[in-house]
Amino acid sequence: MPRNKGQRYPADPPTVAEIVAVMRQTPDKRHGYQVHAMIVVLWRAGLRVQEALELLETDLDEHRGSLLVRHGKGRRRREIGMDAWGWEQLRPWLAARAELPIGPLFCVIDGPTRGRAWSSSGVRFELHRLAVQAGVRRRFAPHQLRHAHALELAHEGVALNIIQRQLGHANLGTTSIYLQGIDTEEIIPTVHGRRGPMMSATAGLRL
């Protein structure tokens, strides 16, 4: 059993530059397209790795910009969004996947189990290998990409309840944990820069 099995790591999501550096390491062939696509759905849609591995090609709707998560945590079903850039990045793998046996979106490419589901350990191995190759020193794992997605949405001003639904959290408290990467230097100017309350609400207050 791995020594780190079940171990929790602090939220330390990779930066955009680090993620892109890793994506640039994916080779220009089918296996590389698949790893590239996996990074995309973990980062740009904020999926859990198991949710990504259970996706079917029919769960993707590029026209609507949506992905259907059939069995999220707690077996909850939800539909989530992904940006246009993310969809564009998926296309090479979608084209390559169409030439393989029908099955899950992310699958074994060669050998006797060709077309069957890819494993979460295989995903983690590839992400770690490519991160080392790219010179990324911080932990680069599926859940870190999910944290990066949540943090980026918060930076863009997306409401907490929408981030909660995108991530499939049962309560806002869990979502708040994902946003602990927002530091004091961001909080102070954001709150300091707020407008004063509406005049009708402050009528009669001493100035």
State what each model feature region is:
Residues M1-L207:
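Conserved catalytic core of the tyrosine transesterase superfamily
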